Regions:
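Active-site-proximal loop/helix segments of hydrolase catalytic cores
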Residues: 32-39, 46-84, 95-111, 173-286
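Gly/Thr-rich phosphate-binding beta-strand-loop-beta motif of the actin/hexokinase/Hsp70
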Residues: 38-41, 349
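Sec/Tat signal peptide C-region and signal peptidase I cleavage site
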Residues: 19-23
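Flexible, acidic/histidine-containing loops and adjacent segments that form or flank the divalent-metal
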Residues: 24-27, 81, 103-227, 292-357
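Local beta-strand N-terminus motif with an aromatic residue
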Residues: 89-90, 114-115, 241-242, 266, ...
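Positively charged n-region of N-terminal signal peptides that target proteins for export
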Residues: 1-5
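Bacterial N-terminal signal peptides
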Residues: 6-16
């Protein structure tokens, strides 16, 4: 963990270095509805921005191509979140991997908002095209936008600590950290065998982060699945307990390993699923089992969409941002550096507060 990479320095400086001056202010997360892709906007107390992924291009499918940014579904939804947050640029864009539902929206978004720096796992494996058609085109378009800003390739273990804020890369390009972080809990009794990934080329290469803001922790692993996801939890937990876990791969069936929930033990899990994309029945079952173990294990699960997948055990409607595809509400999380946080459903206006653990 010796290397200090530029984007983490920017993130740490923009959030950590201002934490004392911004006492009492929150680190805000907007989980934008991109129909089962990802776009998570993080806004520091002083208004700096980190965006994790940009959703789909165009009309919002894997077959869509970039077009008029004024008509771009996901870029416009991200733009709406930035306006709600009162910000007008993206300081750092982290692209977890190069599938269209994570990297496709960058062309149109870059025409709506300036993007200063880019972080990703490097380049796409040409074999990725054999499993998810269009991946090479998505990467080529992304790389053309990336070339206009600063670029950093993320590597596991790279980090920088500053004034209580910590950003650690825990996975990238198919590799993970090999040594436990400070709060890791050791041997994981829930380990069995790794679930096979639905995609063997890009998803397991996802950039994953453990972000901390004072005592608050948030884990985002992109679409990390298969052996790399398993390696973070088994045979030993390498990360430790987290406050909020954005469930890997939109809660797809290959992210349902109960060993990960045992290792990460989130207070709150968030599913960035769509109506049919992500939100697999095995993951719902694993989350329900964890929540039934008591609030000390998993207090709540919040969903971006009600799932219509066969066997999906949706959680309470009050914890779901969109009940169908006619709306595009987000979930907003506001974290304090004492470890407390709140989640707001923008559809209902309901806010639930989670006190210091």
């Amino acid at each position: 963990m010796r290397t200090i990479w530029y984007a983490v320095f920017v993130i740490s400086a923009m959030i950590g270095a201002h934490s004392l001056r911004s006492a009492g202010k929150t680190l805000d997360f907007y989980f934008v509805d991109v129909e089962g892709g990802q776009a998570t906007l993080i806004v520091s107390p002083d208004g700096r921005t980190l965006l994790i992924d940009t959703g789909f291009p165009g009309s919002g499918t894997f077959q869509s191509t970039p077009g008029d940014p004024r008509a771009a579904r996901d870029a416009q939804r991200i733009l709406a979140a930035t306006r709600s947050a009162g910000v007008a640029r993206i300081d750092t864009l982290v692209t977890t991997h190069f599938h269209a539902d994570h990297a496709g929206g960058v062309v149109e978004l870059s025409q709506l908002l300036p993007i200063a720096s880019f972080v990703d796992h490097g380049a796409v494996n040409p074999e990725a095209e054999t499993n998810v058609k269009g991946t090479l085109d998505v990467f080529a378009r992304y790389a053309a936008v990336r070339a206009k800003g600063r670029h950093t390739t993320a590597r596991p273990g790279e980090r920088l600590e500053a004034d209580g804020f910590d950003a650690v890369v825990v996975s990238s390009d198919g590799r993970t950290i090999s040594r436990p972080l400070a709060k890791a809990t050791g041997r994981n009794p829930a380990c069995a065998a790794a679930l096979p990934p639905q995609d063997i080329y890009e998803n397991p290469r996802s950039v994953g982060f453990l972000l901390s803001f004072g005592r608050f922790t948030f884990l985002d692993l992109g679409d990390l699945t298969g052996a790399p996801l398993f390696a973070l939890a088994c045979p030993d937990d390498l990360l430790g307990h987290v406050d909020v876990y954005l469930v890997a791969h939109h809660g797809g069936p290959d992210a349902a390993d109960p060993a990960t929930l045992s290792a990460f033990t989130p207070r709150v899990a968030i599913l960035n699923n769509g109506r049919t994309k992500g939100g697999g029945a095995p993951t719902f079952s694993a989350l329900h089992r964890a929540s039934e173990a008591g609030p000390s294990q998993l207090a709540d699960v919040w969903q971006l969409h009600r799932s219509s997948n066969q066997g999906a055990q949706n959680f309470d409607d009050g914890r779901i941002a969109n009940l169908d595809e006619s709306t595009a509400h987000w979930l907003k999380l506001s974290a304090s550096d004492d470890g407390s946080f709140s989640v707001t459903n923008s559809r209902t206006g309901e806010t639930k507060t989670y006190p210091v653990r």
